[in-house]
């Protein structure tokens, strides 16, 4: 799923190709750099209180400020630090999957980041008002990638990051409902807590307060991650 652009116009330019052609050639790598830079963008979640937990047992807690990746970590990003990671052609900007908790932690650490706690992830997804989904309380399959997308010509498969940006969280984080479950640094006894739901499950798993427990060294094609960074 990945490809690298190769530029073969050097000899033509040396022979006196017009200025227009030279401009077009030089613009291509610039545009690709800007697109790649986009996927490293982070959004700030300010310090303060928010409603945490499932309805009926939710509570108000306070967290310090932090930044979180706007998008799930992509195949291309992950492969820069894990040379053994292979993926299909065309998948550069799909969320990485089939990664363990340790691999996710190592990737974040290489960027001077870390995995979010369950509470940090949930605040980044729902804001302060306790909403059920990043965009509000009513489910809308157009705003996320879940198995409800299997009809009307949309297949229930993993999608490129940022495919449903109209469903972004109050802080601008994308794909917080569906696409792939995401590792957190939180544990429930010996199990790691995953958040966000995936293309494989339905609307209930995609709720901001839903979670899934997993063995830390388990890998699945519907589990990925994103990183956070402390705001100093």
Roles of regions detected by a PLM:
Residues 1-7:
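Bacterial N-terminal signal peptides that target proteins for export
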Residues 9-16:
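Bacterial N-terminal signal peptides
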Residues 66, 131, 225:
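Small-molecule pocket liners
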């Amino acid at each position: 799923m990945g490809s690298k652009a190769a530029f073969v116009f050097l000899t033509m330019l040396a022979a006196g190709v017009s200025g227009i052609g030279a401009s077009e050639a030089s613009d291509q790598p610039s545009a690709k750099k800007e697109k790649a830079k986009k996927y490293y963008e982070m959004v700030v979640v300010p310090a303060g209180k928010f409603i945490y937990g499932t309805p009926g047992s939710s509570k108000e807690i306070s967290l310090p400020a932090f930044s979180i990746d706007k998008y799930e970590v992509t195949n291309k990003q992950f492969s820069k630090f894990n040379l053994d990671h292979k993926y299909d052609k065309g998948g550069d900007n799909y969320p990485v999957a089939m990664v363990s908790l340790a691999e996710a932690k190592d990737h974040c650490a290489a960027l001077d980041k870390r995995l979010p706690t369950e509470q940090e992830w949930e605040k980044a997804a729902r804001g302060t008002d306790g909403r059920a989904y990043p965009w509000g309380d009513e489910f809308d399959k157009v705003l996320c990638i879940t198995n409800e997308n299997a009809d009307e010509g949309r297949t229930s498969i993993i999608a490129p990051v940022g495919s449903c940006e109209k469903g972004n969280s109050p802080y601008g984080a994308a794909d917080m409902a569906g696409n792939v479950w995401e590792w957190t640094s939180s544990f429930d006894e010996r199990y790691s807590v995953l958040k966000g739901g995936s293309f494989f499950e339905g609307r209930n798993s995609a709720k901001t307060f839903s979670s899934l427990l997993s063995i830390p060294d388990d890998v699945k094609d519907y589990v990925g991650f994103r990183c956070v960074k402390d705001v100093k």
